[in-house]
Amino acid sequence: MEIKTTAVAGTLESSDIQIMLMAGDNGIQIDLESDVIKQFGAQIKHVITTTLQQLNIDNVKVRAVDKGALDCVIKARTITAAQRALETTTPAWEVL
């Protein structure tokens, strides 16, 4: 699926993550900012990548600013940003 517009989901509050998706042309590229990047950076990137792959999004630039979000929050924010970027109103139930 192709990203139609830049989209954002999430906040910069504690225990949340802000995900911004932009059109890309070279696979899934993730720019992650996090205070816990050394401990959890690989896991955060894995959750984002897996969620985008489940949504059949192959080419996207991701800007993620993590403030200690749990995996379920990261997945929810990624799904929301993707639906906004794809300009779809129908939830992807199979990913949930």
From Swiss-Prot:
UniProt function note: Covalent carrier of the coenzyme of citrate lyase.
Modified residues (O-(phosphoribosyl dephospho-coenzyme A)serine): S14
Lineage summary: Bacteria, Bacillati, Bacillota, Bacilli, Lactobacillales
GO CC annotation: cytoplasm
Keyword annotations from UniProtKB, A to Z: Cytoplasm, Phosphoprotein
Compartments, record wording: Cytoplasm
Subunit description: Oligomer with a subunit composition of (alpha,beta,gamma)6.
Chief site of localization: cytoplasm
Annotated HAMAP family: CitD
InterPro entries: CitD, Mal_deCO2ase/Cit_lyase_ACP
Alphabetized Pfam families for the sequence: ACP
Family label: Belongs to the CitD family.
Protein name: Citrate lyase acyl carrier protein
Superkingdom field: Bacteria
Record flagged with keyword Secreted: no
Keyword Phosphoprotein: yes
Gene encoding the protein: citD
